[in-house]
Amino acid sequence: MVVGVTMINVVPGEERSVYNELMKMGEIKDVFHVFGEYDFVVVMEVEGLSTLNKLVDQIREINGVTATKTIVGAEL
């Protein structure tokens, strides 16, 4: 399993619709609406890096999303 964390910026006023779209995606485990540099922090758990890449691409296609930044977790 691969854990990815994506920080998302959205168009002001589009937070609710972006949140609703994120919640429809099966691999997303948690969605946090945050204050500061980003609007959302999304935690994903997927089978591999290629699946993570596809999921992030789907997030970027959501109407209202302006930017994303993703980090990948590693086991110690």
Predicted features and spans:
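A compositional/biophysical signature of low hydrophobicity enriched in polar/charged and small residues
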Residues: M1-L76
